């Protein structure tokens, strides 16, 4: 958004999923613990804005519920999100991954472990970007960088 040269000047747009899923009886029962699932994670990240286009990551099919896995055991919850850049040489892939990670870190309980990575085979430098996104120290340093956090916050900004 706001760049002069776009990596993908004409992205394909996809239909959005319905906002609400059917609610089961146990989900209405406040006495039953309702563990987090892939749909809830998808719902948290679907409206993240693309850094280049006036569309959401869902509209561009960058994030998909099918690429989100939630693992829960008695000790911890682990969320793994794969995302698919619109083109294999997308220069914004690291920023998109960071925006997803920051959104989840801000939204989920601190005990939930989060992993964000590029869908295998979908980016020319996926290995390098995945290493950056998995490095807690690099992510923490990025979150302290005002310019980078401004870009991330623009991605996370709710449209008016």
From Swiss-Prot:
PANTHER family: CYTOSOLIC IRON-SULFUR ASSEMBLY COMPONENT 2B, CYTOSOLIC IRON-SULFUR ASSEMBLY COMPONENT 2B-RELATED. May play a role in chromosome segregation through establishment of sister chromatid cohesion. SUPFAM superfamilies: Fe-S cluster assembly (FSCA) domain-like. InterPro entries: FSCA_dom_sf (IPR034904), MIP18 (IPR039796), MIP18-like (IPR002744). It comes from Caenorhabditis elegans. This is MIP18 family protein F45G2.10. Signal peptide: none annotated. One of its GO terms (cellular component) is cytosolic [4Fe-4S] assembly targeting complex. Pfam families: FeS_assembly_P. Keywords: Chromosome partition. Belongs to the MIP18 family. One of its GO terms (biological process) is chromosome segregation. Residues 1-32 are annotated as: Disordered.
